[in-house]
């Protein structure tokens, strides 16, 4: 595999960008190699600056559910850009986008757009504290909710990938207000609320974890969590930055039939542009300025490019309803990987929900962060490098999801599994 130009660019990038990247996992540190520099993408494929072509299962970490450079989305962005890129003032597109979100997500009556998933979770936490008058928050080990001070405790995603236990720069006083519990363990939740229930403002959770790899709790777990938070007057926040509009048009809420108090969104709702959102019941959302006392603002929030790209993507998803076919393709990939694991005796637990999938290199059932961490990281790193050499681009971390798009064909999946078989042979 040619990498000369990528290597040269990475060397240059390290002189100007911290670590040569703008997000840590992109540095490929955990897989023992230098990163690719991507030049272009189309459909299910990306090409790097050395001309290598890959079937892409990263999809910009999830937003590109219709694949790269979808013509309708690109044209929508171009059309709006002709009139200006940002105004810092209300536009009609913001209303149309808000209507689409409220129409789709069962629990959302009002929404506020921001510029990233991190902004969305940060703002939702602030709102929950302002609304309830309480200080403590509950999160779950291995769940990643962006790089917010109060939420980086025992986090997944890059924090897990790089084996960072915490991070300097977060005062102990902040961390002390965050209670971290094991994911998928309702007994721990019940015990915590018995001790601290009167002080807990909110519980924030990925309804299907994707940032420790894909881990799905039971519907009963979510139902009990909903009951407990209601009982103690704490808000339940579902972080659907990853699952929103990906697992179903109404997100994980549509799958589970459970309505949280607040929901955070990102990724898919931007059509590949920077965007985030948080929303919920009108009574709660009207605590946000300028109607209420909880302040939150943003220079580029609701900018026309993100609204145009996101709105067109949501319109296509609503019109086409690709979710059954995405699930079918996900199942095909899941079953193929599981078959290869069994055929070659390579321990692997394959977890999937819809078009999100992770193959953990462990013989344990992966139900939480502790079992996810039992994965053989050296074996994953070797598998990643072998697949990359054969033209399959996976997330450079054991603790991330692979994503499918409508642009991935059955032929893409067949090709991926054929190449995976060659790689499994080399893992023996």
Curated annotation (Swiss-Prot):
Principal cellular location given in the protein's record: cytoplasm
Enzyme class: isomerase
Keywords (A to Z) from UniProt: Cytoplasm, Isomerase, Porphyrin biosynthesis, Pyridoxal phosphate
Positions of post-translational N6-(pyridoxal phosphate)lysine modification: 267
Catalysed reactions listed for this entry: (S)-4-amino-5-oxopentanoate = 5-aminolevulinate
Known pathway: Porphyrin-containing compound metabolism; protoporphyrin-IX biosynthesis; 5-aminolevulinate from L-glutamyl-tRNA(Glu): step 2/2
A Pfam match: Aminotran_3
E.C. number(s) listed in UniProt: 5.4.3.8
Gene3D superfamilies: Aspartate Aminotransferase, domain 1, Type I PLP-dependent aspartate aminotransferase-like (Major domain)
MF terms (GO), sorted A to Z: glutamate-1-semialdehyde 2,1-aminomutase activity; pyridoxal phosphate binding; transaminase activity
NCBIfam families the record matches: hemL, PRK00062.1
Subunit structure comment from the entry: Homodimer.
Family listed: Belongs to the class-III pyridoxal-phosphate-dependent aminotransferase family. HemL subfamily.
Protein name (record): Glutamate-1-semialdehyde 2,1-aminomutase
Native source organism of the sequence: Persephonella marina (strain DSM 14350 / EX-H1)
Designated gene of the protein: hemL
